[in-house]
Amino acid sequence: MSPSLHPLLDNGITKGDPNFPGGNLYCKCSSDKVVVKLASNVAHNHACGCSKCWKPAGSLFSIVGVVPRDAVSVTEHAEKLSIVDASAAIQRYACKGCGVHMFGRIEKDHPFKGLDFVHAELSDQKGWQEPQFAGFVSSIIEQGFHPKGMEEVRSKFHSLGLETYDALSPALMDLIATFTAQRAGVLSANL
């Protein structure tokens, strides 16, 4: 039996609506759920194999995208949120009750500061952007996945029409490199 990439991928990808306006994310608690309102659709939605992202039980990958920071608001039970790892670049706010990561925020100087990382699957609304690529694919080995299974994992992604990377997509890596070059003064800040 092949491994589960993620429930949103295992049976094919459902196309999102490019005009989707956003919606609410809910933690997995049976009562007193944390509710996070997103005032926009996600962008750069992707499967992520890193060891930091929240993943559904049995899944090798998370599905995570970004929204503008000012599009994120906690509307119910903010008191249940705590930061998972204060030393990480992305401050992941998780529910203390169920452990689900509700959003991740970057506070330090970083190419993605101003964007919050979210798991749109925590919404009961349909229309969120579908996954665009798979990132940090090799990182699942660091979490115990046998290296001999990597060809099958990459083949599954390719059969879904998703490119696989061992970092982020080229467009996002270009953004990081541009930020770094501008900070170093080798590129103009006004491109």
From Swiss-Prot:
InterPro entries: CENP-V/GFA, Formald_GSH, Mss4-like_sf
Transmembrane segments: none
Binding site for Zn(2+) 1: C27, C29, C95, C98
Listed Pfam families: GFA (PF04828)
Catalytic activity field: S-(hydroxymethyl)glutathione = glutathione + formaldehyde
GO molecular function: S-(hydroxymethyl)glutathione synthase activity; zinc ion binding
Protein name (record): Putative glutathione-dependent formaldehyde-activating enzyme
